[in-house]
Amino acid sequence: MPKVLFEKGYRFFFFSNEGNPIEPCHIHITKNGNLAKYWIKDSAELSDSYGFSAKELSEIELIANKNLNLIKEAWNE
């Protein structure tokens, strides 16, 4: 599972060859046992969240949007 980014304690990663058929570009985020998934399009869009507060999700979304190009490049490698 490639780690793409680590910022403010959040680990951003994805699984290689996830889903059948392969899912569109997305990123998983974890911190302190909490987990979220964002679709990566023109901006990061929340798919699922388990345990994160609304404030944390806002922070995650800001980080993801700031790093969209990095996430997309890692996905396409």
Which positions does each model-derived feature cover?
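Negatively charged, low-complexity tracts enriched in Asp/Glu with abundant Ser/Thr
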Residues: 1-12
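C-terminal structural segments of small proteins and small subunits
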Residues: 51-77
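Alpha-helical structural elements
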Residues: 5-7, 33-34, 70
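Generic secretory/membrane-interface signal
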Residues: 2-3, 20, 61
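A short, structured beta-strand/loop element
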Residues: 15-54
